[in-house]
């Protein structure tokens, strides 16, 4: 018997999305971003399905070590870099690349005693203003990295876009111009493009692209769908009806009794709630897919359950499947109803949700 709720992960969709992104960036290698437990899809699940990727991008050293322990031998890159002097030796031991975005990291590299140098990606702040060396720091920091025996040569170069998910925003082109101006004629690989830039700013694809959300079949752009770019949703979040009840006009349902039926109907209770990561703030009308149609959430989402209006003539029964998002109901559309982004929905599922590779 399959557990519920569960996130069904399509390995075929993951592979198809990688293939599609290679088609969109044929001159670039792919650094598949699998941070945050593979965007909620399961870190090892995703890495093994995407074994043909040229490398994997991660946020935490622990994630990289989990991949190495799971038999992944591909290039690994720590996108936030390292934070403790002891981490530097771990990078060498497990052959892990690191971003260097702050002088404190450079100081740790300069002070380390290592068996071999570390592969470094120097991050330049071209306009995101979150991580990276300012443009006026670039020359001095680059020369220190060049002089550091613990840094493998050539030094790789990167930046991150603030507004690539706004296809009409000129800020991305300006960031790319600044990057090119600072790095022209320098050796080393370059990476600028995240998912949005890969899809919308082809001129920024460079040596490596760093797709994250697009690998999972989701568009990074609000109001857009992954399928518009030939991508397939890799996650289907499913549960089931655990009750179907006749409900009279005027009667409330759920905590606070704030929703009341305008007419006689049937309500279905779905076994999923905010304890599973489904947003408590999902408003009335948020769609759920039941037996080939969309039905609206009514009443407040509770810890373990939510309620949907099935309609007076519904023939749904206990045990029927309810799809919270997936092929028939894109996660981007659910996110728009709730007032959030698809990234948040797929990454906030709790351990109560079984993640099952199909």
UniProtKB/Swiss-Prot annotation:
Pfam families: Ala_racemase_C, Ala_racemase_N. Its cofactor is pyridoxal 5'-phosphate. Substrate binds at residues 130, 303. Disulfide bonds: none annotated. The modification N6-(pyridoxal phosphate)lysine is found at residue 35. GO terms for cellular component: cytosol. It catalyses: L-alanine = D-alanine. GO terms for biological process: D-alanine biosynthetic process. The keyword Isomerase applies. The active site is at 35 (proton acceptor), 255 (proton acceptor). Its EC number is 5.1.1.1. Pathway: Amino-acid biosynthesis; D-alanine biosynthesis; D-alanine from L-alanine: step 1/1. One of its GO terms (molecular function) is alanine racemase activity. It comes from the Bacteria. The keyword Isomerase applies. Keywords: Isomerase, Pyridoxal phosphate. InterPro entries: Ala_racemase, Ala_racemase/Decarboxylase_C, Ala_racemase_C, Ala_racemase_N, Ala_racemase_pyridoxalP-BS, PLP-binding_barrel. HAMAP family: Ala_racemase. Catalyzes the interconversion of L-alanine and D-alanine. May also act on other amino acids. Belongs to the alanine racemase family. This is Alanine racemase.
């Amino acid at each position: 018997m399959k557990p519920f709720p569960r996130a069904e992960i399509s390995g075929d969709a993951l592979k198809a999305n990688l293939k599609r992104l290679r088609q969109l960036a044929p001159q670039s290698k792919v650094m598949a971003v699998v941070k945050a437990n593979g965007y909620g899809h399961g870190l090892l699940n995703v890495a093994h399905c995407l074994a043909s990727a040229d490398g994997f991008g991660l946020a935490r050293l622990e994630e990289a070590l989990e991949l190495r322990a799971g038999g992944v031998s591909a290039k690994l890159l720590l996108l936030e870099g390292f934070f403790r002097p002891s981490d530097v030796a771990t990078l060498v031991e497990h052959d892990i690349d690191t971003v260097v975005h702050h002088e404190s990291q450079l100081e740790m590299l300069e002070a380390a005693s290592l068996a071999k140098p570390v592969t470094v990606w120097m991050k330049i702040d071209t306009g995101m203003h979150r991580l990276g060396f300012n443009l006026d720091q670039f020359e001095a920091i680059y020369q220190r990295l060049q002089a550091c025996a613990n840094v493998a040569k050539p030094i790789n170069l990167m930046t991150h876009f603030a507004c690539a998910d706004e296809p009409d925003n000129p800020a991305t082109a300006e960031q790319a111009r600044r990057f090119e101006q600072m790095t022209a004629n320098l050796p080393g690989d370059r990476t600028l493009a995240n998912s949005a830039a890969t899809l919308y700013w082809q001129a920024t694809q460079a040596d490596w692209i760093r797709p994250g959300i697009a690998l999972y079949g989701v568009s990074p752009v609000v109001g857009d769908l992954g399928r518009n770019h030939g991508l397939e949703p890799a996650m289907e979040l499913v549960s089931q009806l655990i009750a179907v009840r006749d409900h009279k006009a005027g009667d409330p349902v759920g905590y606070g009794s704030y929703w009341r039926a305008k007419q006689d109907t049937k309500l279905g209770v779905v076994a999923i709630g905010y304890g599973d990561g489904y947003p408590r703030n999902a408003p009335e009308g948020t769609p759920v897919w039941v037996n080939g149609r969309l039905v609206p959430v009514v009443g407040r989402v509770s810890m373990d359950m939510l309620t949907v209006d099935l309609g007076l003539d519904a023939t749904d029964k206990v045990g029927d499947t309810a799809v919270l998002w997936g092929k028939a109901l894109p996660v981007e559309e659910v996110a728009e109803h709730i007032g959030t982004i698809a990234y948040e929905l797929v990454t906030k599922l709790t351990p109560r949700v079984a993640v099952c590779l199909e």
